[in-house]
Amino acid sequence: MQKKDSPVGQALGRSRGGFTTKLHLSCDAYGRICALALTGGQAGDCPQAPGLLRSHLRAGQAVLADRAYDADYVRLQIRQAGAGAVIPSKKNRTVPIEHDAEIYKERNQIERAINGLKRFRAVANRFDKRAANYFATCCLIAVLTWL
């Protein structure tokens, strides 16, 4: 258990440039943010996927994600919900799994959603010291995208 004032407790991770924060999110087909998660900069993407998908994953949907989310447990969660996974296989996967390249082109919606958040200086530069304040700022901006 980390202390709340420790760098890890404040979603700060070490990198070459100093302390960094990584914002994980999922969005719908229109680029509206549905779920957010905040971690330190060195944290992996894949462990955040189950929490991001849990709340709004429905049968018949296609889940688009990049190679960082190519894990069997993520694909299993998507399949159990009755949705389809459109995730390219990592280079080191022994048996590559096919994905629909045409549907995968729509993955830029998540990149647009991230850029929409980072248009706001407070999110792009993380002026907030506390992770809870930064997360609240990101949530507020995410709500604005729905209006």
Predicted feature descriptions by range:
Residues 1-91, 138-142:
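Polybasic low-complexity intrinsically disordered regions
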